[in-house]
Amino acid sequence: MSKESVAIIGATGNIRNYPKSEGRLVDLGRGLVTHSFLVIPECPDPLLGRDLLQKLRATISFTGEGPPEIRTEGKLLVTAPLEEEYRLFLEAPIQNVTLLEQWKREIPKVWAEINPPGLASTQAPIHVQLLSTALPVRVRQYPITLEAKRSLRETIRKFRAAGILRPVHSPWNTPLLPVRKSGTSEYRMVQDLREVNKRVETIHPTVPNPYTLLSLLPPDRIWYSVLDLKDAFFCIPLAPESQLIFAFEWADAEEGESGQLTWTRLPQGFKNSPTLFDEALNRDLQGFRLDHPSVSLLQYVDDLLIAADTQAACLSATRDLLMTLAELGYRVSGKKAQLCQEEVTYLGFKIHKGSRSLSNSRTQAILQIPVPKTKRQVREFLGTIGYCRLWIPGFAELAQPLYAATRGGNDPLVWGEKEEEAFQSLKLALTQPPALALPSLDKPFQLFVEETSGAAKGVLTQALGPWKRPVAYLSKRLDPVAAGWPRCLRAIAAAALLTREASKLTFGQDIEITSSHNLESLLRSPPDKWLTNARITQYQVLLLDPPRVRFKQTAALNPATLLPETDDTLPIHHCLDTLDSLTSTRPDLTDQPLAQAEATLFTDGSSYIRDGKRYAGAAVVTLDSVIWAEPLPIGTSAQKAELIALTKALEWSKDKSVNIYTDSRYAFATLHVHGMIYRERGLLTAGGKAIKNAPEILALLTAVWLPKRVAVMHCKGHQKDDAPTSTGNRRADEVAREVAIRPLSTQATISDAPDMPDTETPQYSNVEEALGHRLRGTKDPAGWWHLPDGRLLLPRAVGRKVLEQTHRATHLGESKLTELVRKHYLICGIYRAARDITTRCVACAQVNPGAAPVEKGLNSRIRGAAPGEHWEVDFTEMITAKGGYKYLLVLVDTFSGWVEAYPAKRETSQVVIKHLIHDIIPRFGLPVQIGSDNGPAFVAKVTQQLCEALNVSWKLHCAYRPQSSGQVERMNRTLKETIAKLRIETGGDWVSLLPQALLRARCTPGREGLSPFEILYGLKPPVVPRVGCDKLASITNQTLLKSLQALQATRSLARATLRDQLPQKEAQQDRTPLFQPGDLVFVKKHDFQQLGPRWDGPYTVVLSTPTAVKVAGKTPWIHYSRLKKAPDNQEEWTVSPTSDPLRVKLTRRAKP
């Protein structure tokens, strides 16, 4: 009965209230309805009320004779618009509530709301496989609020009553972590099994991919039912020996219980639970799939979806599935069941009449995500919205700024306009997502591909009449190598990427790829200058698969829809012609000799080592003359020299028609093949790194345009025949090798005196004239002073011009410039003029590392007034040692110079704080001030907050000025140098050698003659060898001498007394070892089995001492007490001949 009642006035005129029944299913003959009946026990016969007659659409008529007649059939005239006429033939959908109530009566055992948790009747208990190195882990229970504990108490009592939990005593323990259910005061019981998961073997996950699962749903099946299994994991039993590892603490004061509980079923939070349950349920439902081939059943762990063609088929299949689940022991949530509907929500997607779209709840959840503050929040946002990427055209291009913002390790998040625009654009795209069609595997697919800014974009469609219906929007970022290709080749990479993605939805069905590029021609005639053989093969295997894959070229794709433009007048470009124009550095460049060349040049670069130095030179020659030849800086590679020589040849050939020969494959390929590729990539290699010799390559690509016509040919080097090509190449090689050892041309530019004005006489001052006479110089007829050492005395004005010209050619510093010019000229005031010229040079000011001089007294560092008052701290990078240690945290007390250093795996603020709190402050007291550079570990918020809490001043030094931290920087160098020396002597790693390096640094005297050890402890450093008794006579201080002698006598007496009290040991120097190398011995086993041997072996003795031996096959030394001699002749060797007279066969056999 329901709580509702109705007031009734009967024939007597009295008013009485009668109750109404709950809604019951009533079959009216034309369909099912829900009706609440009025319950009147006094009524002798059932009566049809007006409400039920209205649902029957009954007509009551009265005739003259007989009782009234009730007719429920008749003709009804319906007038409707033609476009709405189809509605007359639709079946009225059955309400979800109606079916749920009916099936709760028919199949009561399957519903979770009215039954205890289920148990799969056909599944064997699960055995959990631990790692071979796993040991029990014990993690104490987190504090739980009283409200959460009350909520968990009811859940645990229910599970204990159902046998899902049981008391246990286990060495394992992990905590519970209650999680509040959204919108309620209840808590979900979650166990923190992270430590257990680390110690359990991971099985291969076989859970279906939700990205492709709905692709298995035929679009013509438009009636759906969705079932969600309740407490699904608890249906699978757990083996008793595996139950102990999932124990947790629980105390129930009301029941008077306290101890550990564990699961007897598969627990939630265990990393293998989804896979184990998915496989178990899939096996149990195999029979249902075979019995119902006309419906589709999709399973994602515990979420089930049935799809059928008609409502009747969906009803029948859903009923059978519920009965099957009830028989197997599973439970279905009635609250979440969606029964026989045309629109359902499954895995966050809304499915309706063969299409899928994003559910409103998922969209609203993403739209409410605030602007990220950390890189982790950016990754969380990308992961959440990435689940919806099929509905966002060009997702990869839109999200690229956000992906870029997550790089950089632990660096702070940089959030600018680009990141904000990308964040809002992705959210905006979610507010208007399209409805995507479910893929039909009976129809071919069309893939429209476009590439922009290194991102592949496309849309996968299927034909629906004359329209193209989208199935998915696809997008991926190209790898760095493909992103540097020309646009036509990037289209191939985009097509390959998206075809691979589309195959997850097409399942190998026919696909037509449409692009604005002629992809098929490019694939059949691949440009091997750009693509490696491996990539060509990969693309051809994936895309050249007729008739499954077909290509179609269109003029352009609409950037908004990624579908072809309808305008057929747009031109279609030719990809091969475009690639040829991009590959060639200039259109008329050829590798065949020109017939009417004005000159034929031969280039070569030479690089070789002599006296430990690498000399290099380059030359450009003809058959009878040298065009250009110069030495190159020490250390120049041969490839770089070849590029320079070829560039000089092209520069000399300006406005000429020339043939140029080179024997360098590198220079030839750079000019003909790779030069434009490097330029397109932004001077990057295939791996995304900067190319070598980038300035020389750019100069070569610029110089190739200077000749009027040019042909560059490759010839073999070091040929001995008399062909003109070989002769010219040999000549270029000889000249290049010859000039390599010459001084650089910088000195040649000033080796001769500059051109002096012929019409002007040098104007010497009186001082300069007197200087010329004093140095016994002579004047030539032109008036120039020549000194006896061969130098020329220059007036100040002329001398300044010489200095300026020399500096422009060399950009030498003040001292080197003066030294160089003084070899040829004598100039009064040369040092002042050189200083003025070098100071005024803009190029030198921009490049030279020297900074402006600091006024004396301003660059002094702060030092403490007592030990431990002021510390300088810094991280220095080391080579990676055992344990992953890569950094060294160094702290120096500025007062005493005492150093502390700690190895670290990461350069983080946690490391700094740990050693400050645990090491520095407990040992040296609270510092007044700490100084450091602006490293992330020191400017971190947590570091600064700690200093504020401790009232310690943290001084950040000037950026890019290591002198501000000079004391700790110098200590870094000292420690590294000491460790390097110790590594050379011992071969150990730097972590193990660090204590010895610290000892050396702490005991080294400073400028005042005192070491940090002396300043801190007031004692001499314990590193100087002790002075023995034989040295005491050399000491002149008689008082000190007597004291030392008395101390030595007391020491000797004490040692003698103690020596007499010790037990006498047998002399072992003459004792012969019991076992000799080569002997066979048995080794006693530590743990032998009953009825098994106690001794292992025999083993051969390798080394022996009077007390222990080392045997072959065992690492440790073994004491004599665990050895015994093995009998001799334990094995026998025999020699037998073979078919080869030079070989014999040796056979070893153990004697019985």
Swiss-Prot record:
Domain Reverse transcriptase: 158-351
Annotated PROSITE patterns: ASP_PROT_RETROV, INTEGRASE, RNASE_H_1, RT_POL
Pfam family, one: rve
Catalysed reaction, written as an equation: DNA(n) + a 2'-deoxyribonucleoside 5'-triphosphate = DNA(n+1) + diphosphate; Endonucleolytic cleavage to 5'-phosphomonoester
InterPro entries with a match to the protein in the record: DNA/RNA_pol_sf, Integrase_cat-core, MLVIN_C, Peptidase_A2_cat, Peptidase_aspartic_dom_sf, Retropepsins, Rev_trsase/Diguanyl_cyclase, RNaseH-like_sf
Transmembrane segments: none
Positions that bind Mg(2+) 1: 228, 302-303
GO BP term, pick one: symbiont entry into host cell
Cofactor requirements of the protein: Mg(2+); Mn(2+)
Domain Integrase catalytic: 863-1020
Enzyme Commission code(s) on record: 3.4.23.-, 2.7.7.49, 2.7.7.7, 3.1.26.4
The Peptidase A2 domain, residue ranges: 1-52
Key word NAD present: no
Molecular functions (GO terms): aspartic-type endopeptidase activity; DNA binding; DNA-directed DNA polymerase activity; metal ion binding; RNA binding; RNA-directed DNA polymerase activity; RNA-DNA hybrid ribonuclease activity
Residues the UniProt record annotates as site (Cleavage): 78-79, 751-752
Binding-site list for Mg(2+) 3: 874, 933
Keyword annotations: DNA integration, DNA recombination, DNA-binding, DNA-directed DNA polymerase, Endonuclease, Hydrolase, Magnesium, Metal-binding, Multifunctional enzyme, Nuclease, Nucleotidyltransferase, RNA-binding, RNA-directed DNA polymerase, Transferase, Viral genome integration, Virus entry into host cell
PANTHER family according to UniProt: LRRGT00076-LIKE, POL PROTEIN
Family statement: Belongs to the retroviral Pol polyprotein family.
Listed name of the protein: Gag-Pol polyprotein
